[in-house]
Amino acid sequence: MPKTDIARRVYNHTWKLDPIIRSLLDTDFYKLLMLQMIWQLYPDVDATFSLINRTKTVRLAEEIDEQELRDQLDHARTLRFSKKEMIWLAGNTFYGRKQIFSPEFLSWLARFRLPEYELSRRDGQFELTFRGRWVETTMWEIPALAIINELRSRAAMKGLGPFTLDVLYARAKAKMWSKVEQLRQYPNLRISDFGTRRRHSFLWQRWCVEALKEGIGASFSGSSNVLLAMDNDLEALGTNAHELPMVAAALARNDKELAAAPYKVLQDWNQLYGGNLLIVLPDSFGTAAFLRNAPDWVADWTGFRPDSAPPVEGGEKILAWWKKKGRDPRDKLLIFSDGLDVDTIIKTYRHFEGRVRMSFGWGTNLTNDFAGCAPTEIGGLNPISIVCKVSEANGRPAVKLSDNPRKATGDPAEVERYLKFFGTEDFVEQTVRV
């Protein structure tokens, strides 16, 4: 693939629209895996997704031009999966399985387009909402976040001259490469790119992926970004996300169904997938509650992805649970993915080395770390904590608690109800940076 001079590309904006989303494959692989499950098992469920900016001090509607945002969202709605992309999805091997996507699902997917959106402004923030069938609205999450983040980056760099941009990107590349050099010291470490949602830009994420591929070789497991995985002959990686238990819980008609919701979606998942895709995401309503009530068969799954507890503490609790269930943690897998950077990756790896198999999903601090790279401080280049979460399912409020109370989302009254129902054991309040 020819190299792009990112600084020159950023400076030379002579076209009417520079699309941020170039393909519907420019999304995370787990969205496609979940989409097939939703299409098969929940085709008639409605789900609303809402943009949530947890960094309240950043007033997005004052940094990003609303018309530019509309233009990018409208462009994304014109996209369809190409013939080449459909052939790749049908013929490629994912997680050791051929034809992981059924022909019937792919036939439906070939006709897919993103549904309409609702956009308004309130108190300096954008209110961006996607309503409709879950099987359609779910696909807005990743492109919406990528669009918002890249428009913010572009706005921050407007007016910068070509040499300033050269310096900015040269420093960012050097900073990224210094991290690569640290990771090289641990040849058994396994790193994946999980940086699509809050990336600086598509081109920068592509550069980071190519740098990891060359820089750490076999230690680079692949990318969650399907387009970049396809273009760079990498493994497309990802399992499942919080939206599955969030929707299942919202649809629960009584306390018994609410308690069973986190495990019901795992059973649904197991209908379609197996092996290395049997990864548990335990923290939607608190990891302690999940482990306390988990059926014994959950311990037979391949591994866990602790996503909001401090990695060492969260990992230790899962290892202790496996041992309690009579399983050997050395046969299991932990995938760490919450706010990681090279220091926390190395610290966590060294702590658990030899005790459990590990992989690290490196996200925002891989694809959006420009701190100290600009000749003068540019606040708009600092990453923010922004998510696009399910807010309703069939008209009922959806909630996510997590192990960090600051990451909770949902209607405040419903959040309080869930806290009382599931409890707050082992919750650790931490500053949410990304």
From Swiss-Prot:
Q: Phosphohistidine (modified residue): where?
A: 242
Copy the pathway line from the protein's UniProt record. Cofactor biosynthesis; NAD(+) biosynthesis; nicotinate D-ribonucleotide from nicotinate: step 1/1
Give the CC-aspect GO terms.
Answer: cytosol
According to the UniProt entry, its GO molecular function terms are: nicotinate phosphoribosyltransferase activity
Q: Which reaction does it catalyse?
A: nicotinate + 5-phospho-alpha-D-ribose 1-diphosphate + ATP + H2O = nicotinate beta-D-ribonucleotide + ADP + phosphate + diphosphate
Q: What are its E.C. numbers?
A: 6.3.4.21
Q: How is it modified after translation?
A: Transiently phosphorylated on a His residue during the reaction cycle. Phosphorylation strongly increases the affinity for substrates and increases the rate of nicotinate D-ribonucleotide production. Dephosphorylation regenerates the low-affinity form of the enzyme, leading to product release.
GO aspect biological process, one term: NAD biosynthetic process via the salvage pathway
The UniProt keywords, alphabetically, are: Ligase, Phosphoprotein, Pyridine nucleotide biosynthesis
What is the recorded function of this protein according to its Swiss-Prot or TrEMBL entry? Catalyzes the synthesis of beta-nicotinate D-ribonucleotide from nicotinate and 5-phospho-D-ribose 1-phosphate at the expense of ATP.
Q: Which family does it belong to?
A: Belongs to the NAPRTase family.
Xref: HAMAP family:
NAPRTase (MF_00570)
| NCBIfam families, per the entry | NAPRTase, PRK05321.1
Question: Under which name does UniProt file this protein?
Answer: Nicotinate phosphoribosyltransferase
* Organism of derivation: Sinorhizobium fredii (strain NBRC 101917 / NGR234)
Tell me the name of the encoding gene: pncB
